[in-house]
């Protein structure tokens, strides 16, 4: 299954989980491209689909409408002095730099966050792929990146 999630923003799942077909020799950016466009989203990235792919933002008019960062996450962000700045939140895209300096998109496969770029992963039948928005380097989605603690899994 495949999902795109923004629960750290109080927005729940933007997509899915949905069943997705995976094709031989197709890397994850191509799957992401198909799913996002199918559900009416566009996106920005750096690198290329085949090398150094980094998902910078997912875009659609009103994507952040009604967002509300859970109070527990705000408290943790205040503790690390990365206070959410509403001026950095666009109504039309969600990505790196939204609200905090540590925000961006991460992905996990079968419950494990991947340390390599999406372009290096070839999805297989049965995979559970989650593309998730984090406000602080993954700490709010259950990933202790760069030696940081994890705050829970929103």
Give names to the regions the model predicted.
Residues 1-154:
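Ubiquitin-like/PB1-type beta-grasp interaction modules and other compact soluble beta-rich domains
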